[in-house]
């Protein structure tokens, strides 16, 4: 009987009752996420400072592009080969765990990309289509004579100079 009485629908003082919603909100210690206030003047200063630095970088790129556009296709091809050789040397240094700057990879790749872009712009001006351009590019790559990059030549010269110094 006791069990029946406790299950009855009449509310008792010891029974579970839920307080009204308004009291739940006021008694809660959690009032959402508190984000640190952002000083608008400092964020505006940061925004004002960034464009001039990026503008300077763009000017450097524009200067480099102007310089690249003055070169002939043969000069561009030579420089592309040299940079690709340097990239190969950087990869070798990385695999041998020697000292190298990781930023040099991106820098060299971007320079090669700029040179190839200038080369392609010239082809477009001449009316060369994509398909013919790829065909010409393949032919150019096949005609390349493999030779060591300038940095490797310098290392070889140092090694021969040291060998001669040891003999003397």
From Swiss-Prot:
Q: Does the keyword DNA-binding apply?
A: no
Identify its protein family.
Belongs to the universal ribosomal protein uL29 family.
Q: Which residues form a coiled coil?
A: none
**Pfam families associated with the record:** Ribosomal_L29
Do you know which PANTHER family this protein is assigned to?
A: 60S RIBOSOMAL PROTEIN L35/50S RIBOSOMAL PROTEIN L29, LARGE RIBOSOMAL SUBUNIT PROTEIN UL29C
Q: How does it assemble?
A: Component of the chloroplast large ribosomal subunit (LSU). Mature 70S chloroplast ribosomes of higher plants consist of a small (30S) and a large (50S) subunit. The 30S small subunit contains 1 molecule of ribosomal RNA (16S rRNA) and 24 different proteins. The 50S large subunit contains 3 rRNA molecules (23S, 5S and 4.5S rRNA) and 33 different proteins.
Q: Where is this region: Disordered?
A: 1-20
What this chain does, per the entry, is described as: Component of the chloroplast ribosome (chloro-ribosome), a dedicated translation machinery responsible for the synthesis of chloroplast genome-encoded proteins, including proteins of the transcription and translation machinery and components of the photosynthetic apparatus.
Q: Where in the cell is it found?
A: Plastid, Chloroplast
Q: Where is the transit peptide?
A: 1-58
One Gene Ontology cellular component annotation? ribosome
Source organism = Spinacia oleracea (Spinach)
* Cross-referenced InterPro entries: Ribosomal_protein_uL29, Ribosomal_uL29, Ribosomal_uL29_sf
- The protein here is known as Large ribosomal subunit protein uL29c
Query: Which keywords describe this protein according to UniProt?
Result: Chloroplast, Plastid, Ribonucleoprotein, Ribosomal protein, Transit peptide
A Gene Ontology biological process noted in the UniProt record is: translation
């Amino acid at each position: 009987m006791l069990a029946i009485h406790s299950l009855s629908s009449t509310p008792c003082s010891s029974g579970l009752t839920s307080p009204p919603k308004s009291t739940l909100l006021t008694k809660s210690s959690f009032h959402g996420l508190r984000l640190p206030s952002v000083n608008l003047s400092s964020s505006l200063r940061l925004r004002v400072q960034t464009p001039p630095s990026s503008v300077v970088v763009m000017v450097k790129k524009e200067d480099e592009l102007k310089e690249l556009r003055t070169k002939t296709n043969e000069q561009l091809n030579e420089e592309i080969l040299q940079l690709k050789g340097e990239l190969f040397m950087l990869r070798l240094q990385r695999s041998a765990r020697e000292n190298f700057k990781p930023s040099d990879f991106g820098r060299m790749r971007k320079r090669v990309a700029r040179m190839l872009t200038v080369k392609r712009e010239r082809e477009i001006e001449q009316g060369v289509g994509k398909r013919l351009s790829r065909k010409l590019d393949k032919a150019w790559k096949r005609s390349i004579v493999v030779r060591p990059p300038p940095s490797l030549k310098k290392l070889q010269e140092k090694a021969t100079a040291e060998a001669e110094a040891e003999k003397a």
